[in-house]
Structures are given as structure tokens and as C-alpha cells.
Amino acid sequence: GDWPEPHDDFFITQWTKKGWVRGQGVFDVEMPNFNKDYSASVDSMPVPVITHEIGQYAVYPDLKEIEKYTGVLEPLNFKGVKQELENKNLLEKADDYLSASGHLAAILYKEEIERAMKTPGISGFQLLDLHDFPGQGTALVGLLNAFWESKGVANAEEFRQFSAPVVPLARFSKAVYKNNEQFTADIEIANYSSEEINNKNIKWALTNASGQPLQEGIIPLTNIKIG
């Protein structure tokens, strides 16, 4: 259903009667916008909401994974992709396809998780998936492969920047700015740790691609409740 029943203690869903609560149906029809969240979709929700199977962003097969299947399970899907690339003289592009699709997936997972954390009415999320799922055909939806190994597109430290007990968040209007435009952002903190954060200074910095600070400052003596 699209709304909880009278006796439900919580509600797990990908959409409500008021709209989507995951990136599907949003990211592919809207320009990138980091001000938005899913508040309108969960307005007046009477119970906690868990977003269902968010993510599912496909990554091109890592053909180096073929040699890891040494038991009874044959990676026929990977072998089929490899054969198709060979037939089209594109096998040398396989690593480029993996890298490009993988880094795009990492960006989308980041925005997916951060948008959920920006929504006051969402209590948690179920991810599909951190690793590829080989149980039903081909579901190469992970930043890790089926062996729980990195695909080289995001390491644990990078992933924890947007999926951790405490996550800094920024709201701003678009992804691309011209050099004559002013950049303005609102800073938020998602705190799902075991305790409140009290009387702490929050240091922020805006850096360029080389990591050099363009602007920085301190938000003084901030109290952050759990949630």
C-alpha cells in the first residue's frame, strides 16, 4: 500500500500516496537540486517511515571478477558481456565503462542517502545494495562486488562521509555554478549516534578540486539533538 494501516507500528515503502521517498522517479526527471528532500511525501505520516531498497544503481560488470568463480557457479553473464565486447572490438574499454558507471553510481548513492537524511519524517533506509546480488540473475547494483570486494570506485572512508552515525549535510540549489554566480548553502547535521552533540564548534570549509580551501569558517557552540 501507499499509506500505513491503522495498526502498523512503522511503514516501509518506496512511495506514499503523496509521492516518492527514494530517488527512482525523482533523479531521472529533475535537474540536480540539493535543497529538496521527501518532506512533502511523508507529511502527516502517523508512524516512522523506512525507505525501501533505495539505490539499485547499476555498475558495468568488472570482467576481472570472472576468474574468482572457482566453484560450481558459472559467471555466464560476465562471460556473455566479455564475448559481446570482443565481438565489437571494445574489450579494452571494459575498465573505462566500469569506472565511469561506478563513479556515477557512487554519486547517486550519496545523493540518495543524503536526501533521506535531510528529511525529518524519515526514520531510516534500506539499501539495495552495498554489494552485487547474484541470487536472481544479474543485479550489479553494488559499490562492492559479489565477493564483498571493492570495485575501485569508492572506499570505506569516502562512503562514511555520507553514511555514518553523524553526517554533515549541505542544502544548495544546483550542481553547476558559473564563476560570476554566488554560491549559498545551508549547513545541517544528521546525528544518529547514541548521544546528543552539545556545545561543539563546527568547522566548515569550501575547497577546490585540489583540496585547497576557498572559504572556511566556524559555526560556534552548536547543540545537535539525535535525529
What are these regions (language model features)?
Residues 1-144:
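Substrate-binding/catalytic cleft of secreted carbohydrate-active enzymes
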Residues 142-153:
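Short acidic, glycine/proline-enriched helix-loop-strand junctions
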Residues 153-167:
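Proline/serine/threonine-rich low-complexity linkers at boundaries of modular beta-sandwich domains
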Residues 172-177:
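Short beta-strand segments of immunoglobulin-like
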Residues 225-227:
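Low-complexity, small/polar and acidic-rich linker and loop segments
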Residues 52, 128-131, 162, 190, ...:
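Generic beta-strand/beta-sheet core signal
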Residues 180-223:
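Beta-strand-rich binding/interaction modules
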Residues 32-33, 168-170:
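Extracytoplasmic loops and strand-loop junctions of Gram-negative outer membrane beta-barrel proteins
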